[in-house]
């Protein structure tokens, strides 16, 4: 099993399935996770009103102890992340350090705000496509381009999470986790 650690950002309005499914699948694979709250609140109210207590507050200085950064979607959550300079700088820092940055649903709009999508091939929720003006958008459930891993929506969250496991650990670990969940995707 892996000894990798992943930081998953959450903010008010984050799509809860895209955060919680990722955390759950990564933990099943033995990959450590840390839910980092963006903003001041001790509890995050997600896009469907589910309240989640982050493990701590997003701190870009602490962020570099992680092997990957995940940006879930959700209109309100991604808006908060696009407006947070420390999130944008953290994304750039992860990439500069050669680390994986993953985003799902509207999450790639945060990557665009950080100025890192130019020349990249990626996907997002189709409703976010009009906002994404750089790079090459493709209509695929999960897309890998170098240090970027992107996915489309809550319905692709399991495939996205398993792709993270494969990238951070191995295809064999991803297969074992998928089998244990009876995932047939």
What residue ranges belong to the model's regions?
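Cytochrome P450 catalytic-domain "roof"
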Residues: 144
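Short, hydrophobic beta-strand segments that form beta-sheet elements in well-ordered domains
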Residues: 35-37, 101-105, 120-125
């Amino acid at each position: 099993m892996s000894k990798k650690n992943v930081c998953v950002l959450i903010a008010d309005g984050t799509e809860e399935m895209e955060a919680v499914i990722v955390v759950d699948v990564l933990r099943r694979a033995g990959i450590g996770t840390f839910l980092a709250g963006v903003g001041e609140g001790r509890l995050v109210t997600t896009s469907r009103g589910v309240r989640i207590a982050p493990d701590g507050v997003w701190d870009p200085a602490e962020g570099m102890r992680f092997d990957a950064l995940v940006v879930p979607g959700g209109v309100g959550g991604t808006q908060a992340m696009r407006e947070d300079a420390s999130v944008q700088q953290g994304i750039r820092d992860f990439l500069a350090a050669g680390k994986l940055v993953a985003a799902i649903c509207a999450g790639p709009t945060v990557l665009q705000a950080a100025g890192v999508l130019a020349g990249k091939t990626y996907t997002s929720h189709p409703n976010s496509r009009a906002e994404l003006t750089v790079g090459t958008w493709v209509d695929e459930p999960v897309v890998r381009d170098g240090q970027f891993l992107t996915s489309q929506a809550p319905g692709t969250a399991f495939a996205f999470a398993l792709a993270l496991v494969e990238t951070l650990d191995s295809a064999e670990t991803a297969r074992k986790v998928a089998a244990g969940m009876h995932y047939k995707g």
